[in-house]
């Protein structure tokens, strides 16, 4: 009979850092050029007028104005646009 207890190793004990994804500025809110609108993996939201697409699919404002979310096309794509504040 063994005098020492067999010691196993756990297969858990890992966790990834939070990525802080999601919509940062919602529809109708004012935004300045350069501000991030959506952080995402892939294009869940597509860029519309006045919105740029970053290398990691982040959507950001190219102009000042108000954020507007809409669903367009037969594929029902969710697009994000900037409507100028003076319009």
Swiss-Prot record:
The transmembrane segments are none
Nucleotidyltransferase recorded as keyword: no
Listed disulfide bonds for this chain?
none
Q: GO terms for molecular function, please?
A: structural constituent of ribosome
Assigned GO CC terms: cytosolic large ribosomal subunit
UniProt record, GO biological process:
translation
Q: Which UniProt keywords apply?
A: Ribonucleoprotein, Ribosomal protein
SUPFAM superfamilies, sorted: Ribosomal L27 protein-like
- Family matches, as Gene3D superfamilies: 2.40.50.100
**Protein origin, superkingdom:** Bacteria
Magnesium recorded as keyword: no
Q: Which family does it belong to?
A: Belongs to the bacterial ribosomal protein bL27 family.
Q: Which NCBIfam families match?
A: L27
Which named protein is this?
Answer: Large ribosomal subunit protein bL27
> What is the species listed in this Swiss-Prot or TrEMBL entry?
Stenotrophomonas maltophilia (strain K279a)
